[in-house]
């Protein structure tokens, strides 16, 4: 059932991407801002509990509906609900469409669009011009936040898992934006998202190795583990970025232009996704997954 819902969700998401702008869910920003203000009132040492409460409240309706739809009409209502939740969990924007827009702008010399889309992909407010390796790394990080994390938790816990990961990413993005504006940092949100991203990021990295240059990918993985001195939440993003760039290296180098780097990274993301869907299909065929 999950495999059917996953395949349907991915197909519809790709085909109807122009109709799914509601997935940006801007109306959650006010909720997160209010929740952050309340969480800061918790006694010292209990801020993590406050952040968890803010995270789990929007997930409760999905839990209730999932339980209510189980074993009703051969699970057809549950299947429909799972596809809808998955559609709203993938994103907020279609990564392939954004990469295509970035590549077109790079090819035609549209610097304004390159700068705008580059900022979105790299989640930065800086004015620095995107460079090929940074763009490649950003696409691999975004793939984990927008696709692989959602897919992993959907397979693990159905609509509940997908929506939980989606809300954690929305919360992380809003918290980072408010932190850059006000200076009030909430490390608990980044920690929670890092925990949820830990396994998907490594599975995605393995998919990149299978779909690209296997030896270069594992060399990059070993090199990163040897040189890593970053705190835990940041390692999740860095390992998928490092292995992804290693997997798409040509002659030991990442493609030299933004257009080539973005295209190579997105093709690798697509191959890794197909690889894991194939693995899931085989597991389902042999009765090892549902």
Question: Where are the regions that the model predicts?
Answer:
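Hydrophobic N-terminal alpha-helices or hydrophobic patches in metabolic proteins across all domains
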Residues: 1-290
């Amino acid at each position: 059932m999950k495999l059917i819902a996953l395949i349907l969700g991915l197909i519809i998401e790709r085909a109807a991407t122009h109709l799914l702008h509601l997935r940006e869910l801007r109306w959650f920003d006010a909720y997160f801002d209010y929740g952050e203000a309340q969480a800061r009132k918790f006694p010292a040492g209990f801020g993590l509990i406050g952040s968890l409460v803010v995270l789990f409240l929007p997930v409760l309706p999905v839990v209730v509906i999932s339980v209510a739809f189980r074993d009703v009409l051969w699970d057809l209502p549950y299947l429909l609900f799972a596809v809808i939740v998955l559609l709203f969990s993938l994103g907020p924007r279609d990564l392939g469409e954004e990469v295509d827009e970035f590549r077109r702008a790079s090819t035609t010399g549209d610097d304004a669009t390159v700068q705008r889309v580059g900022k979105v992909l790299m989640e930065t407010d800086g004015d620095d011009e995107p460079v090929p390796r940074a763009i490649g790394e950003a696409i691999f990080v975004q793939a984990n936040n927008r696709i692989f994390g959602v897919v992993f938790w959907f397979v693990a816990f159905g609509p509940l898992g997908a929506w939980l990961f989606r809300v954690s990413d929305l919360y992380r993005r809003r918290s980072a934006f408010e932190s850059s504006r006000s200076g009030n940092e909430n490390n608990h949100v980044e920690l929670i998202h890092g925990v949820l991203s830990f396994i998907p990021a490594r599975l995605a990295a393995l998919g990149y190795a299978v779909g690209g240059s296997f030896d270069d990918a594992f060399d990059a993985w070993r090199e990163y583990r040897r040189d890593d001195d970053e705190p835990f939440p940041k390692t999740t993003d860095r390992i998928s970025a490092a292995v992804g760039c290693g997997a798409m290296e040509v002659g030991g180098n990442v493609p030299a232009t933004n257009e080539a780097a973005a295209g190579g990274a997105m093709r690798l993301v697509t191959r890794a996704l197909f690889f894991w869907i194939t693995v899931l299909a085989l597991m389902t065929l042999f009765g090892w997954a549902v």
